[in-house]
């Protein structure tokens, strides 16, 4: 661009490509570093008691620009005003980020995503539900595998490394908790995970 080989009317297009690829490589590097923590078997969880609703709100707000551009709304349905869990706050924030990122990525315009919390005994359940394209039944067991994308058409235009859900599952399992997925093609997907009450 500096030497004038790219015409001014094309510069915006190429800058967007550069930005997209920079973000993709940043995401890949972050994901690989996170997976490396799990591979060393030395993953130390920094567990504290914190308000999961505050973390959900902050994570949802970080997607405000993307949601506005796609006309997607994120609805938060909370069991109570405050709800404390005992977990690694930074890692749970990463779980929520990855799940919301996927929900937005695979949702169409003018759609909504719901994040809901429920309490059952000593457990807190967090659900992230979208009205997106859904996951084929044949792929449901494979989505947790590293670098897995359900098919070329699903991943072709979608920014992603295929590591997000693998990281999500490993973080939840490191907390000795569970994560499940319910999905119907053409209807949407719901991820539900549990945490210990704090």
Predicted regions and their residues:
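Short helix-loop "hinge" at the ATP-lid/N-box region of the Bergerat-fold HATPase_c
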Residues: 103-104
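Conserved catalytic submotifs in the C-terminal HATPase_c
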Residues: 46-50, 68, 73-83
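Conserved glycine-rich
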Residues: 176-177
